[in-house]
Regions:
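Lectin-like carbohydrate-binding module/patch detector with strong preference for beta-trefoil
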Residues: 20-175
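Generic detector of N-terminal low-structure segments
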Residues: 14-15, 75
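Sec-dependent N-terminal signal peptides
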Residues: 4-14
């Protein structure tokens, strides 16, 4: 018993915090009108992001060499259906279980509006209503306030998962 306990304790020291809770960005597979791609992003700027304003699709910051705090999700928690923005310790949450629901940020409490899962087709759907997928707005991108070229933004919502929306509903992660 003591050997097992010693192995468990030792394993905690061998796993660094960065390995246990590594940040990844979640990006749309289709780059749409920005070659840098679109990532799930907190509205606002990096560490000054305004969590009360919710989520959007925004130019991925990884082209700058690292994942931005307002786009960094806890990779370990993603495997447990929790979409936690590591730097803010806050969860992605749907505003409702109905089509066109917005994405907001709330304290993580594992309620049904916070449980999302990846499908085999690279779609992110709400477990409480598996017909709804995380979707980037099909309209024209809006210009942001920074970047060169200027960063682009689009709205995010939950829409019916359909093949015709694949370019706006298929996602992946990267370090």
């Amino acid at each position: 018993m003591n050997k097992i306990l010693a192995i468990i304790v030792l394993s905690f020291f061998l796993i660094t915090p960065s390995q246990a809770d590594e940040s990844v960005e979640i990006y749309l597979l289709n780059q749409l009108d920005d070659p840098r791609g679109f990532c799930i992003d907190i509205k606002g700027h990096k560490l000054k992001a305004q969590i009360n304003k919710g989520l959007q699709a925004h130019t991925c910051y990884s082209y700058q060499g690292k994942i931005s705090p307002d786009q960094g999700f806890n990779s370990r928690k993603l495997t447990k259906n929790q979409f936690i923005l590591t730097s803010f310790n806050i969860c992605m949450e749907a505003s409702s279980l109905t089509p066109s629901a917005n994405l907001r940020l709330r304290k993580c409490d594992r309620n049904k509006l916070q449980n999302f899962e990846w499908s085999n087709e690279n779609k992110i759907y709400l477990i409480g209503n598996r017909k709804l997928c995380l979707t980037v707005d099909q309209g024209q991108s809006k210009k942001g306030g920074g970047g060169s070229p200027v960063h682009l933004m689009r709205n995010l919502s939950l829409e019916l998962c359909t093949e015709s929306l694949n370019p706006y509903q298929t996602w992946s992660v990267r370090k």
